Amino acid sequence: MKLKTFLIVGCLGGLFTLSSCTAPTNVKDYSVYVNPFIGTGGHGHTFPGAVVPHGMIQPSPDTRIDGWDACSGYYYADSTINGFSHTHVSGTGCCDYGDVLLMPTVGKQQYRTTDPQSQRLAYASSFSHKNEIAEPGYYSVFLDTYQVKAEISSTKRGAIHRYTFPENTESGFIIDLDYSLQRQTNSEMEIEVISDTEICGHKKTTYWAFDQYINFYAKFSKPFSYTLVTDSITMDNGKRLPVCKALLHFNTNKDEQVLVKVGVSAVDIAGARKNVESEIPGWDFEKVRKDARTAWNEYLSKIDITTSDKEDKAIFYTSLYHTGISPNLFTDADGRYLGMDLEVHQGDTLNPIYTVFSLWDTFRALHPLMTIIDPDLNNHFINSLIKKHQEGGIYPMWDLASNYTGTMIGYHAVPVIVDAYMKGYRNFDAKEAYKACLRAAEYDTTGIKCPDLVLPHLMPKAKYYKNAIGYIPCDRENESVAKALEYAYDDWCISIFAEAMSDFESKAKYERFAKAYEFYFDKSIRFMRGLDSKGEWRTPFNPRASTHRSDDYCEGTAWQWTWFVPHDVEGLVNLMGGEDAFVQKLDSLFSADSSLEGETTSSDISGLIGQYAHGNEPSHHVIHLYNYVNRPWRTQELVDSVYRSQYANSIDGLSGNEDCGQMSAWYILNSMGFYQVCPSKPVYSIGRPAFDKAVINLPEGKTFSIVVKNNGKKNKYIESVSLNGKALNIPFFNHQDIVNGGTMEIKMTDHPTKWGVLSPALSSKKEE
């Protein structure tokens, strides 16, 4: 049948009053250092909206609909706002969400977009960045087209909007349920008016998350008349068209404020209503804003830095802010949540479930950072992953809205769990976690509750080849080298977990798998290289060649992937021909031609220093490899170079996708002076601290301080290090040193030194 438009008009009555705000408290305000606009330009893909740490709801302005730079809905170069939707992902390279769009209007409401490919909706408004404010837990902008000031704040499960209108007899709102980022397919959709101040609805979308369910409940402080519109879905004969938009109408006086409260839930509308009513019972916008700021200050205060450089302070606390956006809470206020089996489960709000696990990115630094600043929260993340295995049949690779997406490679829930376990954080069922680790490493397509299109990505044949013949042939499996290297690392993690579980047979098996990286190293050229099913090297070979997601590597080149053996650096050094040969090759990485070759090179290969690509995750540990081969001064000067070239207090201040906190976590750890090269091995590599002092406020009132003497822009080299008053002569220390509390003192100088260089007799013990 042809597309039709249906209008339903009604008028209702009622009114709510506003309460006063509460008085501020006297605490150190770290939030003033945060610039949420960092990463909203370039390809950082962050958003400036009003969120609280790891909250369920992310109200934020949407300035464009589709394309790579619409992943978060907001792009700083844009000059129009389509509205304020309530779900967003931060810093990702894949796109989804943008649900439940709300937009204030003044005048006759336009809702039919003449150009279906336009990035601008019919009711969009122009705006100026000079009239835009973003801070932790608060966002404000003046909508020029309607002369309306928009303000947003949020709690964990609810959002509150405040709009200041001009005098007009045609003021109102548009709630657009049909809208979503990337123009997703809506297989279910409905809006219902409950009263003259309440609207609810639900929809199911199919996109990156194959079966995403979203329910909403909205409460308005001012009564409205309404028009319900359906204009976007053609249904079979005999079925009514679902309502996709609500046009709300009312009169406003000059500077009249109208407030809106919105709750969302993946479970049902009742859950969405309870979420917002339990957390925002009244209409006190300023209280919600203040509480959101307090929540962020509690999170940001976990690390206190001392520096005279305001730009560096903004970068640091914005980085810490970005690590607090996801994973996102997914348990409703009544304890219910949608599981990986897409069934509703009754859970516990004290042990909530989370979603948005970008594990290919975040196992590297985000989760190791969490073991330092909030191990209890990290345990909640781990318990969520275990639940996802139990409900869906396997650990997720990239979980979005309780959907297996199959995005990226590896089984990196494993290092997240094993890293916590090896650091002594074990508030989870270790036996169940271990069983799930073994399941993730084996090729078995049975019992996994995911769409057929996702299954080959979630359970690739690469696992079969790894286990059956010992390596992954490049003529049988895409991205064979990258998968093999990450599997070898994940399998090493399983081997040490097996030992802890007294499963010595599995320990031996996975230790053997952990050495599989050796198959791919071509000693004649000293690169990791594709090996086909006949045992022959991939030819032709070009270490700068890239075909995005369709070659032997994953979002990278042979230059970037050759170094991914974090669990056995000594073994990689030996393959290279010893320390001197390894250093020569590593130096070449940073001086190589930065150009890429190929018709469809990967846009993710960014932030290049030579062929080192800081804008994507496979390179993130590489600089610290110099510490393993007696060249610690190279680690120090290159970390300093990354600070200066890859991070800035600007809209394009990130060299690549922020990736759900990973790019930021790298900066946080390194700027304090250390980095964990191999998650699951609780050892930190010392680099170049950026600040005069950093104090980590640990649980139970302890602190670990890094005090830097003679610090400065030119003084990027370490002269000496002491830990709790004792000289530390190796460029490594243990996680337990942080947990115990204490002080590390680092003295800097302006020239390379021999600090951290070990004699041959001590070299093999450098990480002990």
Model-derived features: where do they sit?
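Extracellular attachment/recognition segments
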Residues: Y717
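N-terminal secretory signal peptides that target proteins for export/translocation
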Residues: M1-K2
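Accessory carbohydrate-recognition regions in carbohydrate-active enzymes
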Residues: A23-H367, T371-P415, Y421-L485, C493-F519, ...
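Sec-dependent N-terminal signal peptides
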Residues: T5-G14
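ATP-dependent phospho-/nucleotidyl transfer catalytic cores
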Residues: D490
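C-terminal motif of bacterial Sec signal peptides marking the signal peptidase cleavage site
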Residues: L18-S20
